[in-house]
Regions:
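Alpha-crystallin/small heat shock protein
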Residues: 1-106
């Protein structure tokens, strides 16, 4: 699951990543696309243990997110806390200049 938010200064991407280790995530930016890929390892099987129900997803994931504006590639911050990966991307000066309020006429 993924949310993308926006302020005047930055874009904020939040991705649910429960059980995923920081070292198992790779984040890249290219062609105005943010790519987040990684893997969630399955728990070690215990001898004699079987599941009544198993709904957790394991394995590799690869998300590509087209960004709605240009960002400054040198001002990106990522943090993994409580199973949520948060990536903050500062908008480029050009993107901020293009943003303007449009008046509505009657």
């Amino acid at each position: 699951n993924l949310d993308i938010g926006e302020t005047n200064e930055e874009l904020v991407v939040e991705l649910d990543a429960p059980g995923v280790k920081r070292e198992d995530i790779e984040i890249t930016l290219g062609d105005n696309t943010l790519r987040i890929k990684g893997k969630r390892e399955s728990q070690k099987e215990e001898r004699g243990k079987s599941f009544y129900r198993s709904e957790r997803e394991y394995g590799e994931f690869d998300r590509r997110i087209g960004l709605p504006c240009e960002v400054d590639a040198n001002r990106i911050d990522a943090a993994l806390k409580d199973g949520v990966l948060t990536v903050k991307l500062a908008k480029s000066a050009k993107a901020k200049e293009q943003e303007r309020k449009i008046e509505i006429h009657t």
